[in-house]
Amino acid sequence: MALGKIKADTLEHSTAGTVDTQYVVNGSAKIWLQYNASHAIQGSLNVSSLADGGTGRGTISISSSMANDDYSLQYSDSCPGSVAVSGIRIISVATGTYATDSCNNSGAYTDGAINCTAVFGDLA
């Protein structure tokens, strides 16, 4: 079976206009992940695994590595009930993994009910 290529400088929708393919390539998330308080993955793109590092801590393994560790990483979570999250942090980044943690108002690590991450940058 032969492998083919699709080459285009722009994408055009019949009613929504056009967009340059550079915007699609450079402006799209290369990784996204949503997981629950039990660290069960609810949905993902380009994630091979999620390691539970203990309460409020997680390490995400990337399926197709990033080109370098200079990518942009967004992380947010929501805690159940009246627990307020006062700190969410990105602990470390590497081409094949990144780690996060979250704390409540008292500074104790806490598992968010819904945890979301997205990564923007270049794939290797």
Task: Report residues per predicted region.
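Generic low-complexity, intrinsically disordered sequence content enriched
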Residues: 1, 15, 70, 94-97
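Extracellular receptor-binding modules and their adjoining Ser/Thr/Gly/Asp/Asn-rich linkers
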Residues: 2-65, 105-124
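Extracellular jelly-roll beta-sandwich "head" domains, especially the C-terminal globular C1q domain
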Residues: 77-124
